């Protein structure tokens, strides 16, 4: 009976470890897993900003572009935005550009942007905009979801869930 219990615990540990590794590895996808069409669709996206002026993501081609799908009611989004503000300030002169795509109402996004002193463009998307994030690897259509494009406009990395400062620094390091 003791051997049987030990074996059960060992198999359970192996299964949980394999599952955890699979989840962790799937969190950050590299370009090879995403079609070029996904980056083209993302760059073709044109949405209104907080002044209701339509902005196309293609205007930032040639920069390292960090596109973050978020909402004001999303707790992990609220945690990572101060990091984005800090990174935008730190790396702006090296060609880094953040763009937030809020899946929320414009008035709520505007108030949030003021309160959090967001120093990069905030565009207003809809739940239909989440289809673009799905094409860029967000299969579950959850928030936050971040797509990092290199200077050539190709998807370099994606992140499902909130980003930490060390993780973001790591992802940006080779692109800047």
Task: Describe the role of every protein-language-model region.
Residues 78-117, 127-134:
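Structural microenvironment flanking redox-active thiols in thiol-disulfide oxidoreductases
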Residues 112-118, 125-173:
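Thiol/disulfide oxidoreductase modules built on the thioredoxin-like
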Residues 61, 69-86:
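Conserved redox-active cysteine motifs that mediate thiol-disulfide chemistry
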Residues 44-65:
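A short beta-strand-turn-helix
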Residues 1-44:
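N-terminal targeting signals for export/organelle localization
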Residues 63-65, 69-73, 105, 142:
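Short pre-active-site segment immediately N-terminal to redox-active cysteine/selenocysteine motifs
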Residues 45, 69-70, 112, 120:
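Conserved hydrophobic/aromatic "anchor" residues
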